[in-house]
C-alpha cells in the first residue's frame, strides 16, 4: 500500500490494531495522517491480545483511534463529519462467526456504499481478501462465481471500479496479526492474500441531441444529430498534438508510408452531412447503413459570397456554451446541444429509416445523410485541388486556398516511390464517419477513417506495393491481407475487416491506376494497443489518455483502469404493430444503455394469427470497460429501454 506525502488514511474494521500500529511506524517519517477505527466498544477492543500497546503506538505516531465506528455507516459517524480521506482500508473483512458468502457480500456492498461518503474525489479504497474470496481472475485458484464474495460487483454498486489487484504485502507489516476469524483472535491466511484497489468511476452522462449548422453544397443547413451519436461528436481525437491512440495510429501509418511515398494530408474542413447526389459517386457504400437526416432548416448561401467566403462561413465550431472549438480540423460545423427531452419533438424524426429510400431525392427537402465515408468529399477536394493547380499557372502559390500538411518523410525515387523516375504522391484526409449498424461487439456506429489516394503508373503494380507496405507495418499486430477483385482487404481477428485497398483506372490516362486506401483507425487502435474494447476509445476518463501520454508507441499493451467488469444479461419481449424498424430499436438501445450494451441477440418471434401483431424477444448483454456497471445500474438502463420503447416506438412490453 504505497502512500504519497500529505495523504490521509482511514482504517476500518480494526481488531487488535496491529495493522494500524505497523502502518503508523511505516509512515512515521511522512506527512501521512492515519485514523484507525473499530466496531467494538473500547473495553471489548482492549481484550484483544496486544491491542493496548498497538493503540499507544498509533497515538504516539500522531494518529487517531476511534471506537464504535460502523464501517457500513461512515457517513453517520460524528467523529468523521466533514472529513475526507485519500485512502480507506478494510483488511480481511468478515461478518463474524460462521457467515456465508451472501452475508459477506452484503457487508462489502454496504461498506463500499458507506466509504464513498468519506472518500476524496481521486481517492482509493483498499480491500484485503484471502486468496479465492474476491471472485476475480486474479485469484489462484479462482472460485466459482456464486461461491465468491464478488468484490468487484459489490464495489460497482457504489460506482467504484477495480483498478488494481496485487499481493498483500504481509512482510511489510511485520507486527500485523490478523484477527476476527469466526469472531476469535484467530487470523485469516494472509500469506497469499490479495489487495484490491478501487477508484471512483466517472458518472454516466445523459445523451443529448446536438443541433448542427453547416454549409453543404452551397446551402446553409440545420439538423439534429441523433442522440445515440452525441458522445462521438466534437471529441478532437485527430487534432494537432493529440495523444489519443487514434491519432497515434494515424501518425504511425503515415510515417511508415512516407518512407516510400510522399504523403500530403489536407487540413480543409468538410461537413458531416452528405447529399444523395454526393453518395452516388461512391458505389461501394451500402446505403442501408446510412444515418438519414431530416433538415430543420435550409437557406441558400448568398451569391455575393465568394467560394472562399463560403468555406470560411462554416469554420466555426461551437460547444453547448457557445465557445469556439477547433479541435477537429474536419468538423466544419456549428454545434449546440440541449437535453434530449427538451428537443424530443424536433429530434424524434431526425433518424430516417434505411428503408425510406423511396422518398424522391429531388423533392423540396432532398435526402441527406451523415457521411458514411470520406470518399465523396475526397473526390470533391481532389477536383478542387486540380482546378486550383490548373488556374494557378503563373500566378504563384495557391496554398492559401488549398491547405495541406506534408507528412515528415523523404520523396523516394525508384520502384517504390514511382516508376520511370516519377514519384507518386498520396493525398489523404481523415475524420469521423458514421454507420447505422445494429448493436454488436465489433459494429461501430462511428469511427475515424483514414483515406489515401494516389495515381500510379499501372506497370508499377501499386496495389501490390501499397499492400506490401501496409503488411509490413500491420502484420505484427495480427492484420493479414486478402486479395479480392479490384484490390485487397485488410483482415484481423476478432473484428474482421479493418481496411481496403482499391484500384481503378485513372480518368486522365489509361496507363495510370488510381489507388484508394481506406483504413478504420479505431479498430487498428484496438489492435495496435491491445485494447479490450473499442468503446474505450471514447472514454472521458482522464486515466485513458494519461496512459498514452506515457506509452505512445504501438505495441505497448494498454493497462485497463477498470479490471474484470461483469457482464449482465437481460431479456426483453414486446408486441409490435404491422411495421417494425429494427434500426430504431438498436438506436434506442444505445441511447438508453449509455452505450453499455455490447450484444443484442434475437431469441424468438411470434406472429399473432388473428391480429396484425408480432412478438419479439431479444437478449441484451450489458458490459462496460469505461464505467462502473452494477447489476442495479444495468437493470435501471434496461427499465429505461422499456420506457423508451413504449413511448417512442409504441410497442407493448410483455
Stretches with model-predicted labels:
Residues 133-211:
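Class I S-adenosyl-L-methionine
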Residues 121-129:
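Conserved beta-strand signature within the Rossmann-like core of class I S-adenosyl-L-methionine
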Residues 4-24, 31-35:
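Conserved class I S-adenosyl-L-methionine
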Residues 46-80:
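S-adenosyl-L-methionine
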Residues 476, 483-654:
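A carboxyl-terminal module marker
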Residues 105-121:
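A short glycine-rich, Lys/Arg-flanked "PGG" loop and its adjoining helix->strand segment in the class I
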Residues 75, 83-105:
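A short SAM/SAH-binding and catalytic strip from SAM-dependent methyltransferases
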Residues 212-449, 453-455, 493-518, 526, ...:
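Class II aminoacyl-tRNA synthetase-like tRNA-binding/catalytic domains
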